[in-house]
Amino acid sequence: MLAIYLAPVYILLNLYVLRWSYLWIGNCHHLFQSTVFRVILAIVYVLISTTPLTGFLIKKPASLHRILKVTSNYFLGIFMYILMIVLSADIIRLILKYVFHASWIHSRVAFAIAGAICIFSVLLISIRGIYHAKHINVTPYEVTVDKSADELDSLKIVFIADTHFGYNAGTIHAKEIVKKINKQNPDLVCIAGDIFDNEYEAIHEPKKVKKILRKINSRYGVYACWGNHDLNEPILAGFTFNPGKEGAESLKDPRMREFLKDSNIQLLEDEAVLIDNSFYVVGRKDASLIEKIEEKRKTPAQLTEKLDKDKPIIFIDHQPKELQEIADAGVDLDLCGHTHDGQTFPGNITIKFLWENPCGYLQKGSMHNIVTSGSGVWGPAMRVGTNSEICTINVTFQNS
């Protein structure tokens, strides 16, 4: 419903951008002032700016649906920076006009130069952001757990989250992730949810993606938990629609579970596994997902109550919530994703006010919490001010 209420605001903002586009381009050359050019520009802009809606409504043919969704993801990111830069330029114009009484700002040359600066800035940020999102960094962590892991002195974990396989990520992204993982020669691979992007059909050639993921090499295997986007849920410009009680079951897509099984990824849903009689891996249900599909999840204490707490306990939980409760439950290493570290500016700043640990490392008593910015993106197909990453965690055990 919120998407419907915000639609008039979105329309007004696009009209605002289009108006200033006419003014700036028109001052570059008289040909751009013609009615024909204005009509063509308006048609092209409307077609692109409405792709969030048309991609939501038009499902077939599948090829057109994909084009609209991909275009929408790129446009939403670019539009965000168009709006920020145009608003900034307009504020500067008003200050120059009413505070400094600068008469030269009304000249054609001033408009043309201002427009060129704005266009260059948008292009620079957008191209850089789109390219940067596709580059995956390797972020290292060193952790010491004051417990014995039987004969195991250390453990190398590769930790990823938020792959968001779909319109923004497919076979190329999967190959890059697997290549980076295998290069680390891990003992264990953990995936903290949001493997999918709300729509299984969004994955282009899922069989190929599964085949690629099966090539992950690790001594003890690959373990994962669900994230809030690991369900079949219609999205309009980032806003979801609640299907109600009768539609809750429709959100579950069995193909997602089958995808993980075929990819040799073991899904843990409020479950714990003892590996090599040395340490536990616990996968937790996602807090947001269970509300939508009307299920319940166990508390951290319930998940660990039957475990041998003398052994190291590794938690995989999509969202970095209830950190104190998790620490009190005897967990030694808590691995989370979800935040994307804000993904794009200014989100990378505001995210710090929303989470106790928005990204990186935090210690709670003897528990180590690591939140990754994710190896993929959600929504806008870009990263500005943040990195796509996989994490390597070298865990040292204090064997007595």
Which residues make up each language-model segment?
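Hydrophobic alpha-helical transmembrane segments in integral membrane proteins
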Residues: 112, 122-147, 167-172, 176
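Short, functional N-terminal and low-complexity linear motifs
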Residues: 40-43, 59, 108-110, 145-148, ...
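Non-catalytic terminal accessory segments
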Residues: 1-134
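Soluble catalytic domains of enzymes that build or remodel membrane lipids, polysaccharides, and related
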Residues: 148-400
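Short, functionally important structural connectors and interaction interfaces within domains
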Residues: 63, 128-130, 135, 144, ...
